[in-house]
UniProtKB/Swiss-Prot annotation:
Gene behind the chain: cyaY
One Gene Ontology term of the molecular function aspect: ferrous iron binding
Protein name (Swiss-Prot/TrEMBL): Iron-sulfur cluster assembly protein CyaY
Xref: NCBIfam families: FeS_CyaY
Record flagged with keyword Lyase: no
Free-text function comment from the UniProt entry: Involved in iron-sulfur (Fe-S) cluster assembly. May act as a regulator of Fe-S biogenesis.
Keyword Lyase part of the UniProt annotation: no
Family according to the record: Belongs to the frataxin family.
Keywords attached to this entry: Iron, Metal-binding
HAMAP family referenced in this protein's UniProt entry, alphabetically: CyaY (MF_00142)
Cited Pfam families: Frataxin_Cyay
GO CC annotations on file: cytosol
SMART domains, A to Z: Frataxin_Cyay (SM01219)
Length: 108
């Protein structure tokens, strides 16, 4: 994948996360979302955080959550965990639901 393709796909991930948080905040959630360049910080009511950031040199998207740190690479049409193959949005949904204490589903 070229650098341009990576940036287009990775920025789409950040935009999808932002859209989901905005929609969740219209419902029962209270998630603070801060973007600083290519880093998104989601802060939940209990003070816990999830950080999603882009890693252009490695062409990856990373998640840092209470569950740990996870690296995702674009493979066969989806961002997949480099160790387990878990899809990015499914994993982020699980981590955010755990930390928020309420269900939240992230999609592309």
């Amino acid at each position: 994948m070229s650098d341009t393709e990576y940036l287009t796909r990775a920025e789409a991930v950040l935009a999808a996360v932002e859209r989901t948080v905005d929609a969740a905040n219209d419902g029962d959630h209270d998630i603070d979302l801060e973007r600083n360049g290519s880093v998104l910080t989601l802060t939940f009511e209990n003070g816990s955080k999830i950080i999603v950031n882009l890693q252009p040199p490695m062409k990856e998207v990373w998640i840092a959550a209470k569950a740990g740190g996870f690296h995702y690479r674009y493979v066969d049409g989806a961002w997949r965990d480099t160790r387990t193959g878990t899809e990015f949005f499914a994993a982020l949904s699980e981590y955010a639901t755990q930390q928020a204490g309420l269900p939240i589903t992230f999609t592309a």
